Curated annotation (Swiss-Prot):
Residues 347-398 are annotated as: Interaction with MYO6. A zinc finger (UBZ1-type) spans 371-396. This is Calcium-binding and coiled-coil domain-containing protein 2. GO terms for molecular function: zinc ion binding. Belongs to the CALCOCO family. Keywords: Autophagy, Coiled coil, Cytoplasm, Cytoplasmic vesicle, Cytoskeleton, Membrane, Metal-binding, Phosphoprotein, Zinc, Zinc-finger. A motif (CLIR) lies at residues 133-136. It comes from the Eukaryota. Dimer. Part of a complex consisting of CALCOCO2, TAX1BP1 and MYO6. Interacts with MYO6. Interacts with GEMIN4. Interacts with ATG8 family members MAP1LC3A, MAP1LC3B, GABARAP, GABARAPL1 and GABARAPL2. Interacts with ATG8 family member MAP1LC3C. Interacts with LGALS8. Interacts with TOM1; the interaction is indirect and is mediated by MYO6, which acts as a bridge between TOM1 and CALCOCO2. Interacts with AZI2. Residues 314-341 are annotated as: Disordered. A motif (LIR-like) lies at residues 203-206. Its main location: cytoplasm. It is found in: Cytoplasm, Perinuclear region; Cytoplasm, Cytoskeleton; Cytoplasmic vesicle, Autophagosome membrane. It comes from Macaca fascicularis.
Length: 398
C-alpha cells in the first residue's frame, strides 16, 4: 500500500492513556540500511478488532502525541479475523518516505480514534558496520535480558487476565448489542411506515404545487411576453436616441470646427487690423509732420497753404473718390492728383534765390509717401508692392 495524500486521523491523546500491548510488532531490527524498503510485521491480540482508518506510523523516539509522526501507511484489513493467519499482518514503507538521519525511531499502531494500540522497540536508519556484526554479550546483559523477560512474562499474565475480563465485557456488550439491534429493527419498521406516509403526502403536495406552478408560469409567460415587447420598443427608442445623439455630436463638432476657424480668422483679422491701425497712426503722424514742415516752408517763402493748387483734399471731400475696399482711404490720392507738372508752382527762395525749393521738397514728400513700412519689423516696401506688403504683415500673425 502506497502512502496517500490524505492525512491520518490523529488526536492529542497523551502516552499515559494509550494501550501499547494490543498490537505486537515482530522481527523489528536494531537498524535498517538507508535506501531500501522497510517491512513492518505486526500481530493483533485476540480481543483487538482493527478498523478501516487504522494506520502505522514511524515516530521519532520521545514523541508526545500521535501528530508527531514522520510518515505513515494505512493498515490493510484482514478478510477473516477468526483465521489465525489474519492476525499476522505487515506493511511495507518505501525508501523514499523513510527518515534520512540516524536518530532512533519506532513503529506505532494508531487506530482511527487517534489512540496508540501498539509500539515497537527503537531502531535506526544507518549503514551496517563491524560492531553490529560482532556482538559480545556480558553476564550483566544476560541478567538484564532475563529480568526483562520476567517482566514481559508478568505483563503477559496481566494481559491474559485483562483478556478474560475483556471477554466477559465483550459478552455483555454482545447481549446489549443484540438488544439494541432488536430495538433498531423496530424503529426501522416504524420509520418505513412513516416514510411511506410522508411519501404519499409529498406526492399529493407536489401534485397540487405543480398545478399552482403551472398557472403561475402561464401568468409569468404572458407578463414576460409583454415585457419583451416593451423592451423591444425601448431598444428602438434608445437606438433612435443614439442616432440623434450621434447626429447632434457631429453637428456640434462641425459647429466647433467652424467656430474654431472663425476664431482663428478673427484673430488674424484683429492682428491685421492692429497692424494697419498702427500704420495709419504712423502715417497720420508723418502727415502732420509734413504739413507742419510744408507750412513752415511756405511761410518762410511768404506763401499761404490755402493758395496752393495741389492741396491734399480733406477726408470729407475725397472720401467718395477713394477705393471702397480700403479701410482708411488712399493716403496717396492727394499727392498723385497734385503731382502733375502743370499744377506745380516753382518759387524762388527770397534769401538764396533758389528756384528748385518746391520741386526738391515735393520730391522728398513723394518718396516718403510712396513707401510702405512694416509696423512690426520696420521693413520698407514700395507703394506698388501693396499686396506683397499685406502678405508680409499677415505672415507675422501666423
Amino acid at each position: 500500500m502506497e502512502k496517500t495524500i490524505e492525512d491520518p486521523p490523529t488526536s492529542a491523546v497523551l502516552l499515559d492513556h494509550c494501550h501499547f500491548s494490543q498490537v505486537i510488532f515482530n522481527s523489528v531490527e536494531k537498524f535498517y540500511i538507508p535506501g531500501g524498503d522497510v517491512t513492518c510485521r505486526y500481530t493483533f491480540t485476540q480481543n483487538f478488532i482493527p478498523r478501516q482508518k487504522d494506520w502505522i506510523g514511524i515516530f521519532r523516539v520521545g514523541w508526545k502525541t500521535v501528530r508527531e509522526y514522520y510518515t505513515f501507511m494505512w493498515v490493510t484489513l484482514p478478510i477473516d479475523l477468526n483465521n489465525k493467519s489474519a492476525k499476522q499482518q505487515e506493511v511495507q514503507f518505501k525508501a523514499y518516505y523513510l527518515p534520512k538521519d540516524d536518530e532512533y525511531y519506532q513503529f506505532c499502531y494508531v487506530d482511527q480514534d487517534g489512540v496508540v494500540r501498539g509500539a515497537s522497540i527503537p531502531f535506526q536508519f544507518r549503514p551496517e558496520n563491524e560492531e553490529d556484526i560482532l556482538v559480545v554479550t556480558t553476564q550483566g546483559e544476560v541478567e538484564e535480558i532475563e529480568q526483562h523477560n520476567k517482566e514481559l512474562c508478568k505483563e503477559n499474565q496481566e494481559l491474559k487476565d485483562s483478556c478474560v475480563s475483556l471477554q466477559k465485557q465483550n459478552s455483555d456488550m454482545q447481549a446489549e448489542l443484540q438488544k439494541k439491534q432488536e430495538e433498531l429493527e423496530t424503529l426501522q419498521s416504524i420509520n418505513k411506515k412513516l416514510e411511506l406516509k410522508v411519501k404519499e403526502q409529498k406526492d399529493y403536495w407536489e401534485t397540487e404545487q405543480l398545478e399552482h406552478l403551472k398557472k403561475e408560469n402561464g401568468h409569468l409567460f404572458l407578463s414576460l411576453t409583454e415585457q419583451r415587447k416593451d423592451q423591444k420598443k425601448l431598444e428602438q427608442t434608445v437606438e433612435e436616441m443614439k442616432q440623434n445623439e450621434t447626429t447632434a455630436m457631429k453637428k456640434q463638432q462641425e459647429l466647433m470646427d467652424e467656430n474654431f476657424d472663425l476664431s482663428r480668422r478673427l484673430s488674424e483679422k484683429k492682428m491685421i487690423y492692429n497692424a494697419l491701425q498702427r500704420e495709419k497712426e504712423r502715417l497720420e503722424g508723418e502727415n502732420d509732420l509734413l504739413k507742419r514742415e510744408n507750412s513752415r516752408l511756405l511761410s518762410y517763402m511768404g506763401l499761404d497753404f490755402n493758395s496752393l493748387p495741389y492741396q491734399v483734399p480733406t477726408s470729407d471731400e475725397g472720401g467718395a473718390g477713394q477705393n471702397p475696399g480700403l479701410v482708411y482711404g488712399n493716403p496717396y490720392s492727394g499727392i498723385q492728383e497734385s503731382s502733375s507738372p502743370s499744377q506745380l508752382s516753382i518759387k524762388k527762395c527770397p534769401i538764396c534765390k533758389a528756384d528748385d525749393i518746391c520741386d526738391h521738397t515735393l520730391e522728398q514728400q513723394q518718396m516718403q509717401a510712396l513707401c510702405l513700412n512694416c509696423p512690426i519689423c520696420d521693413k520698407i516696401f514700395p507703394a506698388t508692392e501693396k499686396q506683397i506688403f499685406e502678405d508680409h504683415v499677415f505672415c507675422h500673425s501666423l
